[in-house]
């Protein structure tokens, strides 16, 4: 559905999908999709799903309070690598922390305010820019005001 409320049917090719990108207008809402899969042995599929879950449990803070991946990968680099290189692994501001386990995840330690999370993210962005010249782009959609400046719908 586009911004005017008109319904569209779009092919996969027209969507121009790439990493963290879709070629359609940002204000469109997707109401359904047809996904193509292939049949497989249920036991093998379950085994593979379990392997993926276990790998994530080792590498990501899946049991912590996070908003998921914080910054998009600045191709060809990986966000966690430039964050780590800038010395931000485990960085804590108020109740917010860059995960020591996977430093592209911000963790709410239990008492983080929106300001703590914003300040931590912006501090990481500044340190990464200073350390290696990379501009990290927020992957988390932020809504509201920060220090008197509207950030509704902005990616930073």
Task: Go through each PLM region and give its residues.
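Phosphate/pyrophosphate- and phosphate-bearing ligand-binding catalytic cores of soluble enzymes
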Residues: 2, 7-119, 126-156
């Amino acid at each position: 559905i586009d911004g005017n409320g008109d319904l569209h049917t779009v092919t996969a090719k027209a969507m121009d999908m790439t990493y963290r990108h879709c070629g359609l207008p940002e204000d469109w809402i997707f109401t359904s999709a047809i996904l193509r899969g292939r049949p497989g042995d249920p036991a093998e599929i379950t085994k593979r799903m379990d392997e993926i879950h276990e790998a994530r449990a080792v590498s990501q803070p899946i049991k912590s309070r996070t908003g998921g991946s914080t910054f998009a990968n600045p191709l060809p680099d990986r966000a966690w690598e430039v964050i780590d290189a800038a010395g931000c692994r485990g960085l804590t501001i108020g109740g917010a922390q860059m995960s020591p386990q996977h430093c592209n995840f911000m963790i709410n330690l239990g008492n983080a305010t929106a300001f703590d999370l914003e300040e931590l993210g912006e501090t990481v962005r500044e340190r990464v820019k200073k350390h290696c010249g990379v501009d990290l782009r927020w992957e988390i959609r932020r809504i509201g005001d920060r220090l008197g400046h509207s950030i509704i719908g902005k990616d930073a």
